Structures are given as C-alpha cells and as structure tokens.
Amino acid sequence: MDETQQFDWYLLRETDKARCFSESVHGSDSFWVPRSLITDYLKYPPKNPGELPLCMVEVPEWFAEKEGLI
C-alpha cells in the first residue's frame, strides 16, 4: 500500500473526475486532484457565507511530491 499524506485544503470546485483545491482561503494557486487518487476526504461547512469550505484530503505521497505539494 502506498504511503499517504493528509492536507487541509479549500475546495474551489469539483467535477465527476477531479476536485480543485487551494491552500489559500482566497482560492489562489489552485490545483486539481483526480478523485481516484483521494484516499480520504472530509468537507467541513464554511464558517461564514461566501467562504470556501475547508477539507481534509488524503492523497498518495508520490502524487503530493510530484505536484510539489510537500
């Protein structure tokens, strides 16, 4: 089994095949993660209306390294 990394990212948008996240609450520097690579996912409700929801996302370590996320 692959090693995984857990991140707290903000969800910008999602499709059937991928989710778009940002490390910033403002949505800057966004990136896509294929749903098939997300091993664990939990979306929290936004604290205030109009804010992006914060998510706990777990992905394979090799993917995080390849994308420069760690």
Q: What is each model feature region?
A:
Residues 1-70:
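Feature detects long, helix-prone N-terminal segments enriched in hydrophobes
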